[in-house]
């Protein structure tokens, strides 16, 4: 019995040491809850505009970010490594586990509730409302909310950057998805086969807008990730494109 007790104490000490070391190694403290059901179907759609996360390749390991982290949509697509902080709530954490999620949604503030009593996503709290599958990788279901340690990490994606062009006539809305590296975009421009480069403005989430007549032209994009890498993707959209169609490039971000 004493041997068992010794190893239990040792394991707890290692968890605390691990969390302390993580915090000192570029990790940030925050909190996490979960939503969306066991299959994460309730996380589809969202404020980034990705729609069906299954078909878009983002899968079930995703999260809605609090206002402080969402940054007006500029954080859409970013990847975060998250672990439950067992140094604070060992009874609710799955010690030694971590999960990588993609930011796909906004967890809106609830001003009717206090920041420490239900208003988990209120500024300035760094909070992740995780999909249930992601949550259950690191925490016990019954906990409801746990303290976490997190850091932004590199995103890995299969295939190239994708562009979906929606809109009408003199208004194009370009959804950019499947972004590797930093996962998110800080600037975009488009060039029609009959135009020069036209800067795009973020409309909402990962959707960027252009107020020009581009129908019937092949489209090229110049995209800068939040990591600072710029890709020029020439004629990825052929001149016969139609609104609502998605086109996949053969280029991808490293950072």
Swiss-Prot record:
It comes from the Eukaryota. GO terms for cellular component: extracellular region; membrane. Keywords: Cell wall, Cell wall biogenesis/degradation, Membrane, Secreted, Signal. Residues 170-249 form the Expansin-like CBD domain. It holds the Pfam family DPBB_1. Residues 1-21 form the signal peptide. It is a peripheral membrane protein. GO terms for biological process: plant-type cell wall loosening. Its main location: secreted. This is Expansin-A28. SUPFAM superfamilies: Barwin-like endoglucanases, PHL pollen allergen. Residues 45-160 form the Expansin-like EG45 domain. The keyword Cell division does not apply. It is found in: Secreted, Cell wall; Membrane. Belongs to the expansin family. Expansin A subfamily. The keyword Ligase does not apply. May cause loosening and extension of plant cell walls by disrupting non-covalent bonding between cellulose microfibrils and matrix glucans. No enzymatic activity has been found. May be required for rapid internodal elongation in deepwater rice during submergence.
